[in-house]
């Protein structure tokens, strides 16, 4: 799988289907994807089943004792439980469940923003993303430095 990159706008049709841009379809190279709530609760994440099962979930359920940790159980309920496997149809569309779209303000016949973030695609209501982006006042350099310092320790 190639890294998922780029920013795209796409429209959800009257049946709730979202056409994936061709570059994202090629990078996903899968006939099935997983959609789940974003970690901030204001967008959705889309990833391959392989990445979801073998990387993403492994980070949350890192040990057999993970079920004994209250915070990990809560995270599993909020993120893993609502995850759904979706087929990519012959036209490159996915049908995101209404309940997941409602949770992040994406309606039928509305535009959404798709952002490749490496191993996942974030799906946003454009207005929500604009507000989120405005609230992030740190520069890219400052964010990178902060992450570097945290990883170093």
Role assignments for model-derived ranges:
Residues 1-10, 14-15, 23-86, 90-91, ...:
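Flexible "stalk/tail and boundary" regions
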